[in-house]
Amino acid sequence: EGYGLEELGIPVTKARTVATDEYLRTIYPNIYACGDVAGPYQFTHTASHQAWYASVNALFGRFRSYPADYSAIPWATFTDPEVARVGLNETEAKEKNVPYEVTTYGIDELDRAIADGEAHGMVKVLTVPGKDKVLGVTIVGEHAGDLIVEYISAMRHGIGLNKILGTIHIYPTMAEANKYAAGAWKRAHKPELLLRLVEKYHAWMRGKAKDEAGRMKDEPR
């Protein structure tokens, strides 16, 4: 109220936000809205995210428009310890009937957390069953709002846990928790058949080496 929306006839939603389309455009092609007034998220970082789409669409919409992408919107609750998340959690996955697997890594095992007296919390990752694609992540612990960024990037750009595991993380840092969570997922999906074949191969090689050493010992000098 008080911004002239009533006079212009621009509708508002039940949540009392300005009604916009996927391009953040109101019923008037030259009026856009973003941030808290547009919703659906009341976050400063989401407002900044929307501002890019609103600005670009307002300036260049006659050539091409971009729908606002909400596929990887993160948020954090700055309690003690912090709680941060992005994507689906288990409750949402069940409500939407989305199949998922859960991998959990306890931050109490992390060297940096132990050294700083912050050895509590966890990293919980939801993935597509049998694949490393990230569906959502929840982190509880010190600096959770900082740690979640790696997973935001992973979800936004289609990076799986294998890539995170293969990325060098500085030791000792809290960020290693992300790598170790990916490592926990990898261990749960290790190729059992291949490992058994490798075990047999090395056992055979050890036996072969032992036989060769025995023959060399028996040969006259």
Where are these regions (language model features)?
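Rossmann-like dinucleotide-binding cores of NAD(P)H-dependent redox enzymes
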Residues: 41-48, 56-92
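FAD-site-proximal beta/loop scaffold in flavoenzymes
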Residues: 1-64, 150, 165
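Flexible, glycine-rich terminal cap/loop adjacent to redox cofactors
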Residues: 73, 78-89, 94-221
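Solvent-exposed alpha-helices and their adjacent loops that cap or buttress functional pockets
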Residues: 25-26, 30, 69-70, 115-117
